Amino acid sequence: MKKDLRAHCHTIIAGNHEQSPAEHFYAMAKWCEEHQVKHDVYGDGEFINSFQQKVADLLGFEAGLFVITGTMTQATALELVCRKKRNPVVAMHESSHIYRFERQGYQLQNRFSILPLGDMFRPWTAKDLNAWPDEISAVLYELPMRELGGQLPSWDELNDIKAECEHRDIHLHMDGARLWECAAYYQKSYKEIATGFQSAYVSLYKGINGLGGSLLLGDKKFIEQASIWMKRQGGNVYHRTPYVVSAAMQFDQQLAKMPALFARTQQIYQILREFPQLAVSPYEPQANMLHLIVPLSLENAIELRDRLAEQKGVWLGHPQTTQHPEQSIFEWYVGDRLLNIADDQLREVLAYLANAEC
C-alpha cells in the first residue's frame, strides 16, 4: 500500500471524519472543563463509574467495566465462564475476531477451546448450535457480523438462540463491537437486543469515534471477577480518563446518528442497483455497513484503488480477497462521510469501478 495516497485524497468514502490529535485533544479539554471531569485512579472515580453505569443501564446490565482493549475483554469474559463451569468449551462463528484475528491467543494461552458454528457465509442459528452434541460453557454472537458485511440474524432467529442457550444453560455472550449499528435494522432498543445475553462487550471507538477502549457488561459479581482478572493481565491502567472522556463526549451524539446512517445505507443500496457490474453483501442492508463486491482480482483492485486516488483524489479503502480469484470486496462503513457525499459524486465513483479495465 502507498501510505501517502490516502492522505492526499480529498474524499474518503468509508467511516467517519477523523479529527487531528490537536483538534480531538482540544475538544476533550473543553468538554472536561465544562463537565468538571476529574481523573479516575486505577479505574475508580465518579466520572468513569457514572459512564460505565450509563452504558450498563442502556443495555439492561447491572454493571460495566472499562477495559483497555476488546481483545482482553472478550477472551477474559469467556475464560471466566469456563472456569466457573469447569468446562473449557466455547462456540462461535468462524469469522469471529477471537477465532481469526487474535493470533490464536486463546489456544496458546490455554484459555478455552472453540467449536465453529454454522456456515462460513451466514449468521448461525439455534439449529447450528444444536448440531454440536458437546457440553458447551459459553457461546459468542457478534451483532452485527463484520466479516459478513454486517449481516444479522432475524429477530426471531436471535430470540430462538437466546431461548436455546437458556434451555441448555449456556452462557450467551455478545460481541457488540458494532452493536450500536444494528438497532435501526431491528427497530428495537439496545436493552431489548441485549436481553437474554449474560454478558456483552461494546467498543468505545468504532461507531462512537473514541480514542480506544471497550466496556464489559454483566452482573455485578461477574464484573467484579473480571476486574480482578484484568489487573492480573496488566490491564490496570492508572488513568482511564482520556479514553472515557473521548467516548463519553460523543456517545449520545453518535448513537443519535445511527438511524440516519442506516437510512443513508438504504439509499446507497438503491444507487448500487444502477450498476449491475457490482454486487453487494448482504443483499439488503442490515446495518450501516456493507461489502462492495467488484469483479477484480485483489491485485487489480489495489491497482484500481491507487489509480482512483491519484487521478480523482478519492480513497476507496482496502480491498480483500474472496473465494473467487477474480473478485474482491471493499468494506464500507457508512459514516458521516458517506452521509454527506452527494449522490452524483457517489455515482461517479461507482461508474469508475463498474467500468474499470485492469
Task: Report the location of each language-model feature.
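Conserved N-terminal alpha-helix of the aminotransferase class I/II PLP-enzyme fold
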Residues: 18-69, 83, 94-99, 105-107, ...
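PLP-dependent aminotransferase-like
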Residues: 82-141
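Active-site C-terminal subdomain of aminotransferase-like
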Residues: 147, 152, 195-276, 281-287, ...
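Conserved C-terminal alpha-helix-loop-beta "cap" of PLP-dependent enzymes
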Residues: 85, 277-358
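Hydrophobic beta-strand scaffold residues
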Residues: 113-114, 172-174, 315-316
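Active-site phosphate-binding strand-loop segment of PLP-dependent enzymes
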Residues: 122-176
